[in-house]
Amino acid sequence: NVVALKPVSAYGKKGTEALAREIAHLMNGRPLENTVFPAQLAFNIVPEQHKSCLAPELQQLFPEEKINTTVTLLQAPVFYGTTVIADIVLEDALPKEVITKMLVSLNDIELSDELLTPVTHGSNQSKIYLQFISDEQAEIQTFRLYIVTDLLRSGRIRNAVSLAEQLVNPVMH
């Protein structure tokens, strides 16, 4: 399962200007004139109605694997910085150290124990910040990844797919 919170920068300049305008209108007690988002976005989270391309792209990368992915896209009221929360279920349990070592070895990834936010870590950053969350067991089969990145600087959806590929390949093969 994957939950992705998109910044308004995904809409380009019109998205960032629209959120700034919504905030200004609401802070000054004026009514909203929404033209970009399907609903008020300032101080709100809006579910995306269209299908994500992430699940089909993951299936294309691993045609021999049966990938059951549920993707939920939410439009977040932040200007920059994408947040992705991915729940990973492995076919077989692995030692926690093996998974941690694999995550540390990923290209352009910084594994972090600190609080990750799209404002601090997803704006004007070219790295992909990742937090590994799991039970305290020695061997784990399920874990959560909390990922924060600036898609404008680090690339588009391909980075998420590339990350998934690097994570899944060593585990599945």
Where are these regions (language model features)?
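C-terminal active-site/capping subdomain that shapes the small-molecule cofactor and substrate pocket
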Residues: 68-173
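Active-site-lining helix/loop region of Rossmann-like oxidoreductase modules
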Residues: 1-101
